[in-house]
Amino acid sequence: MRKNVKKVIAPLLAAAMALSCTVCVSAAEDETIKLTVWGAEEDQNLLKELTDKFQEKYADQKFDIQIGVESESTAKDTILTDVEAGADVYAFADDQLPDLVKAGALLKLDDYAEALQLADTTLDDVKAANVEGAIDAATIDGSLYAFPRAADNGYFLYYDSSVISEEAAASWDSLLEAADKAGKKVGMTLASGWYNASFFYGAGFTTGLNDDGTTTMDWNGTSADGYTGVDVVKGMLDITSNPAFMAVADGDISNQLASGNLAACVSGTWDAMTAQEAFGDGYAATKLPTFTVGDAQVQQGSVAGYKY
């Protein structure tokens, strides 16, 4: 799997760094081009390997490349504190793109098509190598602003099958009951619209994106499925008030898994290795559970997202 990831990221990183060199610096061969690259903690070794290869390819140019740790989930917040001081190349999740574009923190790639040839690629190559949704999510007003890197930015349920049966994992009610009997918790991040939206999506509510990048929501009304936003919130409160539920800070699921506190959690592929280590032979994953809305069991929704 790591080898496949490397094949995907290598040309994209090379293209991004080549663009940064072209845009930020007009250096002679005896001058040093300074670049800063940010990526997730688990990608640091990979980034070091790829940046080393980049420097080998352009050995006639001197580079000073600094690699820093920055999660895709927090990249926007860090960048927007000081765009000029931010990294030249960084990874982020697709929902951050409108704000980054508005702040001038991303290049309009269409304006630098010729520069991409330094990395032996073209915009047509980038578009052809990725699914349409990933390209669309990185496009604003007809212009592409980022290189798609992954299409796995969604979430589901990890659970320890030695504690939680497949049947128990099917609903929040039975999931929490099984975890409580084992003296364990079920973790989920709720202080994030990206996660708590899953309850509303499951009940038939929607969100949309305005031309100015702001989000529209219909959660205050009645969904097409006949549920009200109040009904959904009551269902969420039933879950979160259960003693077996643990509200986990964004990005902290991995730490809670490693601590041994959890029998199950809502997360994505980025926590797969940690979940496997924590649950051992009991490691299992499945769709999100159903939850109670009024008198009905409603399938909790999820999202399909991209990373750049």
Kindly give the residue locations of the regions a language model identified.
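Conserved N-terminal structural module of periplasmic/extracytoplasmic solute-binding proteins
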Residues: A10, V23-K102, T286, V293-D295
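Short helix-initiation/N-cap motifs at beta->coil->alpha
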Residues: G68-T78, W172-D173, F245-A258, W270
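Short helices/loops that flank or line small-molecule/ion binding pockets
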Residues: K76-G86, A103, V163, E177-K181, ...
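Hinge/lid segment of periplasmic solute-binding proteins
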Residues: D94-Y155, E167
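Extracytoplasmic/periplasmic solute-binding protein
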Residues: D136-A150, Y155, S174-N220, L262
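Glycine-centered hinge/linker elements that transmit conformational signals in sensory
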Residues: T215-A249
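Extracytoplasmic/periplasmic substrate-recognition and gating elements
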Residues: E277-Y308
